[in-house]
């Protein structure tokens, strides 16, 4: 199994159980999330209630909740939204922090493609939910979530160069 960690913080952000599609010249990865139900399920199907802890029918256990699989699996933490000015400041800082951690070849690809990816993201800022890894570090790579037209499941966007592949 492959896990993809935030190159800047080490937080786990994705795994190969969630297939991705490269967009914006490979700068962004697009991953489909799904709403799932999680929680304790305690089902007793025997016909003898007195032998199954309790003499009365206790009804349904309401400790289940709906979550997005990617957010739940990697314990992503939602962040406040960004306006255009704040997002551009984030991107400038992100480029400055990430570039030295990349190989020379990856630096060239990243520098060439990040402008196009930023232009792709900017007009969609109001549609995004923003997430970072579990550690909630100030220097974290942002993960973007939005709903495509007519979809009930969110789509996530990751900066491909901000991920480090780790074999488990």
From Swiss-Prot:
Known tissue expression: Expressed in flowers, leaves and stems. Expressed in roots and siliques. Detected in seeds. Highest expression in actively dividing and differentiating cell types, such as the meristematic and division zones of the root, the embryo or the elongating tube of germinating pollen. Expressed in cotyledons, leaves, hypocotyls and roots. Detected in mitotically active tissues such as shoot apical meristems, root tips, lateral root initiation regions and anthers, and in guard cells.
Which keywords does this chain's UniProt record carry?
Calcium, Cytoplasm
Tell where it localizes. Cytoplasm, Cytosol
Where does the record place the TCTP domain?
Answer: 1-168
Gene Ontology cellular-component terms for this entry are: apoplast; chloroplast; cytosol; Golgi apparatus; nucleus; plant-type vacuole; plasma membrane; plasmodesma
- Functional description taken from the UniProt entry: General regulator required for the development of the entire plant. Regulates the duration of cell cycle. Probable activator of Rab GTPases and upstream regulator of the cell growth-regulating TOR (target of rapamycin) network. Might also control spatial growth in pollen tubes or root hairs via the TORC2 signaling branch. Involved in the regulation of abscisic acid- and calcium-mediated stomatal closure, but not in light or H(+)-pumping induced stomatal opening. May regulate microtubules depolymerization. Binds calcium and has a cytoprotective function.
Q: Which family does it belong to?
A: Belongs to the TCTP family.
Q: What is this protein called?
A: Translationally-controlled tumor protein 1
Organism annotation: Arabidopsis thaliana
Task: State the encoding gene.
Answer: TCTP1
């Amino acid at each position: 199994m492959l896990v993809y960690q935030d190159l800047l913080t080490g937080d786990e952000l994705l795994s190969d159980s969630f297939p991705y599609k490269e967009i914006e010249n490979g700068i962004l990865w697009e991953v489909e999330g799904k709403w799932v139900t999680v929680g304790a399920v305690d089902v007793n199907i025997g016909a003898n209630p007195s032998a199954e802890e309790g003499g009365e029918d206790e009804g349904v256990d309401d400790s289940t909740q709906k979550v997005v699989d990617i957010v739940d699996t990697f314990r992503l933490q939602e962040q406040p939204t960004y306006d255009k000015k704040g997002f551009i400041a984030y991107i400038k800082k992100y480029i400055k922090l990430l570039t030295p951690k990349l190989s020379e070849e990856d630096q060239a690809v990243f520098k060439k493609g990040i402008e196009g990816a930023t232009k792709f993201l900017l007009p969609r800022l109001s549609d995004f939910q923003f997430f970072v890894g579990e550690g909630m570090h100030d220097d974290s790579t942002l993960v973007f979530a939005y709903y495509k037209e007519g979809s009930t499941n969110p789509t996530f966007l990751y900066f491909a160069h901000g991920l480090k592949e780790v074999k488990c």
